[in-house]
Amino acid sequence: MAEWKTKRTYDEILYETYNGIAKITINRPEVHNAFTPKTVAEMIDAFADARDDQNVGVIVLAGAGDKAFCSGGDQKVRGHGGYVGDDQIPRLNVLDLQRLIRVIPKPVVAMVSGYAIGGGHVLHIVCDLTIAADNAIFGQTGPKVGSFDAGYGSGYLARIVGHKKAREIWYLCRQYNAQEALDMGLVNTVVPLEQLEEETIKWCEEMLEKSPTALRFLKAAFNADTDGLAGIQQFAGDATLLYYTTDEAKEGRDSFKEKRKPDFGQFPRFP
């Protein structure tokens, strides 16, 4: 078993690391890991830290226990206009979390056991990969409880499973077992519950062996197809970052600092 080390301490999540892998766990098993604005704020903080940590190459998102990955927003704190935290301001800050997961230039893996329902289902959708236990259950509940996700939860879901299936998932609010999810391309693999973490770590370790720059650009390219100009901006930012590491870019910088004309003729013009 992996020996996870606590990276930071939070009230409603766990944030741990192990051999280049960060694991962020929603720690509210008593409510099937439903999230509050505080839960989401803590996840955003942990994801941002994992993004900035150069020792972390892959991030895992999980739920405490084996009964639920995440059951979505905690309906007990849902108020007028959003979910209400200690500051009494209604929020839908999970949208910020979804976007953060998409733009982090590292693979994010959903490790799903039990229920991935509602907003929890959308969280696994926006992750790059999903490893599911054989007890996993997937589905949307929005139209049953007066809610919906008209962003990644529907549009990107349709890219994954097709428009007809995505409409079925949302219009009927049925639940699907792990094998059904695998058959529709909603998850990457299904393993026995007792092997879930072991298999997830195996996938993470395989990715850690790959070029981090290649993975960064591949993620940006995959997302650019669905994220419009914001996706292109992310891809362009990654390209600029890579360009800054070249001798050609350094020549432009240094010539400005040295108040001389840059010598770009020394660099090849590839076809």
UniProtKB/Swiss-Prot annotation:
Protein's UniProt keywords contain Amino-acid biosynthesis: no
SUPFAM superfamilies the record matches: ClpP/crotonase
Metabolic or biological pathway: Quinol/quinone metabolism; 1,4-dihydroxy-2-naphthoate biosynthesis; 1,4-dihydroxy-2-naphthoate from chorismate: step 6/7; Quinol/quinone metabolism; menaquinone biosynthesis
Cofactor: hydrogencarbonate
Keyword Glycoprotein tagged: no
Biological processes annotated in GO: menaquinone biosynthetic process
Marked site positions, Important for catalysis: 83, 244
Entry binding sites for hydrogencarbonate: 140-142
Biased composition (Basic and acidic residues): 250-263
Alphabetical list of InterPro entries matching this protein: ClpP/crotonase-like_dom_sf, DHNA-CoA_synthase_MenB, Enoyl-CoA_hyd/isom_CS, Enoyl-CoA_hydra/iso, Enoyl-CoA_hydra_C
EC class of the enzyme, as a word: lyase
GO cellular component: cytosol
Annotated TM spans: none
Family: Belongs to the enoyl-CoA hydratase/isomerase family. MenB subfamily.
The protein, known as: 1,4-dihydroxy-2-naphthoyl-CoA synthase
Source species: Bacillus subtilis (strain 168)
Lineage: Bacteria, Bacillati, Bacillota, Bacilli, Bacillales
Gene that this polypeptide is encoded by: menB
